[in-house]
Amino acid sequence: MSIPLLEYKPSSQNQRVPGYEVPNEDTPRIYRIEDAAYDSELKELIWATYRQVFSEHVILKFFRQGNLESQLKNRAISVRDFVRGLAKSEAFKTLVIKSNSNYRLVELALKRLLGRAPYNKDEEIAWSIKIATNGWDGFVDALLDSEEYQSNFGENIVPYQRRRYKDRPFNLVTPRYGNYWRDKLESERYIEGDIKNFLELAKSIEIKTVTFTPVSTANIKIPDTTRNTTPTGIPISVNPSANFPVR
């Protein structure tokens, strides 16, 4: 039996109140699959979903999910199921899950899947317990099946940062991994020019003593290079235009 989600009190955020801002260049573009009438528009929607879920401006071909893309193009799955598949993919687990703690995974998931930051530490603790009990896949299902996701994005809208006002976009202020993983990578990296590396290298060198083997010249057998026969004929020089007599 899984532990129910702990209660937490939502804090005041922009997306919780209605807005009357005039649309400008900072207003997020909303991608709906109903608006993707052409193949180019569908590709833009797919790329927008990758950018939202992975928060990467460049997606390697190795990390792309061709099976999910094909199902979405054929309308076999909804945008919500496409987002669900990307969040549960091995590529996402390799890039994000393996390099973050549960608390930070909650922050990243709320920003990328629900389009908002965590309300407070209590919400981070509550969702981190959900990850510990139901696993990452269960946590993703809980977010995408929630009333908050359904009421804001439904089945066919790509998630986006809701009501961003003056703040910078989440992808610019929330890198793929935190300070802990960065420091871990730095400690494991070979630092060129560090004197400690030279000292460790010098200590690791094992000097082998050279042993000399005495050799007596009397024991060296010189091969006999004399000939038993006398050469006959006229020797020809290397230069065919000249020759020399035989005495």
UniProtKB/Swiss-Prot annotation:
Signal peptide range in chain numbering: none
Family annotation (Pfam families): PBS_linker_poly
Protein name: Phycobilisome rod-core linker polypeptide CpcG2
Keyword Transport part of the UniProt annotation: no
Keywords: Antenna complex, Membrane, Photosynthesis, Phycobilisome, Thylakoid
Described purpose of this protein according to its UniProt entry: Rod-core linker protein required for attachment of phycocyanin to allophycocyanin in cores of phycobilisomes.
PANTHER family according to UniProt: PHYCOBILISOME 32.1 KDA LINKER POLYPEPTIDE, PHYCOCYANIN-ASSOCIATED, ROD 2-RELATED
Gene source species: Nostoc sp. (strain PCC 7120 / SAG 25.82 / UTEX 2576)
Similarity comment: Belongs to the phycobilisome linker protein family.
Subcellular location: Cellular thylakoid membrane
